[in-house]
């Protein structure tokens, strides 16, 4: 029997590769969940990603979203790849952490010696117009390259005087993790490479939905037809695609 969750609910910000994830929202707490499919039309919801760890500690009033599973690229496909016998996933909302799994369904957060969740990618320091000075969040799927594990991430700043934008502004940066130590950051952009410019990226068009302005929020990266493309949310009300040949 299905159980109705109290408060507003939704599923959103899915990341798709050869495995999948999404996050569900119960009231004010987003929580990472897993869904699987063999044909991309029919989906099975597998439940909350961290439900088995520490007797469900990370299912009760614990914010988790935006899972980016580490993959390898084979042609146009991104396939979840085991490293040291496990699958790995970067995730987080106000900072990026790491989790592992043997099944791609049940996940465990990599905790420190005190049993706490460390942030591998924290917001940039305050005092300058950093694009991610308030929030860092996993964006595209992470994938293995010759230099390390590459991932696009989303960052938020309370204002961007360099762009003449005010309010919360969501932009995108790039990060590189060490393949031998997945907790180690070996490269990170100081400036965003993608930010709100178009009217549909700056202005939310959904009246009464509580959406935000000034948002370019990247969720998926694909390689197709010899070009890199990513899909991204625009001002919490539309979806667009950006293309690069580099």
Please tell me what each predicted stretch does.
Residues 10, 141, 220:
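Short, surface-exposed charged micro-motifs
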Residues 1-4, 12-134, 143-211, 225-246:
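Beta-rich carbohydrate-recognition and catalytic domains
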Residues 207-209, 216-221:
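Extended, compositionally biased non-globular segments
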């Amino acid at each position: 029997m299905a159980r109705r969750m109290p408060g507003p609910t939704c599923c959103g910000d899915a990341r798709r590769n050869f495995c999948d994830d999404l996050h569900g929202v119960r009231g004010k707490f987003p929580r990472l969940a897993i869904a699987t499919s063999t044909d991309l039309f029919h989906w099975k919801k597998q439940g909350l990603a961290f439900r088995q760890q520490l007797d469900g500690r990370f299912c009760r009033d614990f914010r988790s979203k935006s899972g980016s599973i580490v993959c390898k690229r084979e042609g146009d496909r991104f396939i979840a790849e085991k490293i040291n016998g496990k699958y790995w996933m970067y995730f987080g909302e106000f900072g990026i952490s790491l989790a592992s799994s043997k099944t791609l369904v049940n996940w465990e957060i990599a905790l420190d010696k005190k049993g706490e969740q460390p942030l591998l990618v924290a917001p940039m320091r305050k005092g300058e117009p950093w694009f991610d000075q308030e929030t860092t969040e996993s964006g595209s799927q992470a994938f293995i390259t010759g230099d390390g594990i590459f991932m696009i991430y989303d960052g938020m700043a309370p204002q961007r005087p360099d762009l003449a934008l005010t309010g919360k502004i969501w932009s995108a940066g790039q990060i590189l993790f060490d393949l031998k130590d997945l907790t180690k950051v070996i490269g990170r952009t100081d400036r965003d490479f993608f930010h709100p410019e178009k009217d549909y990226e700056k202005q939310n068009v959904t009246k009464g939905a509580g959406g935000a302005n000034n948002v370019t929020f990247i969720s998926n990266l694909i390689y197709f037809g010899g070009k890199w493309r990513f899909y991204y949310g625009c001002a919490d009300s539309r979806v667009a695609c950006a293309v690069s040949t580099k």
